[in-house]
């Protein structure tokens, strides 16, 4: 099982994503979130086909297709976190922390 926690920026919402290999080609997803928009996405996004999500263009993934429908703004980082959890659970990439850090001017 792979689990990630996301705290979004300005909206201050939190989401926990649990990815668990359900068979050789699929990962099951479970979400706990404070965001009503991500909850709507989670209600539909129960399982992902690993090969399909990793082989199509970004906007053709099931994650971003549903994000386009439910997420409140384009800069939401939760869809990227879902794909990261999928990659780790499928043993495509090792788990590694990701960050977005805003720097002060001149740094």
Which residue ranges define each predicted feature?
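Basic/polar, acidic-poor N-terminal "presequence/leader" segments
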Residues: 1-30
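Glycine-rich beta-alpha junction loops
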Residues: 10, 35, 86
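Aromatic-enriched hydrophobic runs in primary sequence
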Residues: 2-3, 11-13, 55, 59-64, ...
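Active-site- and interface-proximal helix/loop "cap" or "latch" segments in soluble metabolic
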Residues: 23-83, 93-94
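C-terminal charged interaction modules
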Residues: 80-107
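Generic preference for hydrophobic/aromatic residues in regular secondary structure cores
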Residues: 4, 17-19, 63, 99-106
């Amino acid at each position: 099982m792979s689990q990630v926690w996301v705290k979004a920026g300005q909206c201050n919402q939190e989401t926990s994503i649990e990815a668990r290999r359900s068979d050789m080609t699929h990962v099951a997803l479970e979400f706990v979130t404070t965001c009503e928009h991500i909850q709507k996405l989670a209600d539909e996004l129960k399982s992902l086909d690993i090969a399909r999500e990793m082989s199509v263009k970004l906007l053709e993934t099931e994650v971003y297709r549903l994000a386009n429908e439910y997420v409140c703004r384009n800069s939401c980082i939760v869809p990227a976190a879902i794909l990261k959890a999928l990659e780790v659970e499928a043993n495509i990439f090792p788990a590694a922390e990701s960050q977005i850090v805003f720097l002060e001017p001149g740094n």
